[in-house]
Amino acid sequence: MAEPPRLSEMTLPEEKSVIYFVTLCVKGRRKVLADAKVFDAIKTAIQQLRRWNVLAAVIMPDHAHFIVGPREERGLSVGDFATGFKRLVRQSLGFQSWEWQRGCFDHLLRSDENLESKRIYAQDNPVRHGLVQKAEAWPYYFDFVNDPGKLATSPTEAQRI
């Protein structure tokens, strides 16, 4: 079956910094991401992203959630983040028996309240999926504002960069 036509990507006005909640999935929803080697490759890829800030990420077995924003260039699309990130992970891992699903899901976070709700959603995802009993026990979470594995207590602590 052919894929439905895709809408062209949109960019927002330049007057305000933007933060997105982005979900990337593994093709066929294969459970390959919750692995120490893959997690290291993901962290390396995020550190190599030059045009995007990653405020937090939760890596699930078959998908990953990110809270991201462009550093300075307002003309960037979420597709630029997804493409660049996937390429960097692939380069870091070398050959892999799996591939990323095409595209991504993204949601523009319009307020601190929205940012907080998505942060909590991502943090609690391993609990909802029955992988751990407490979110703090999930090893495949990090942010680049606080200590790895520790979430900011409020969106303003996440310092929208």
Regions found by a protein language model. Name each.
Residues 1-161:
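Short catalytic/metal-binding and nucleic-acid-binding patches
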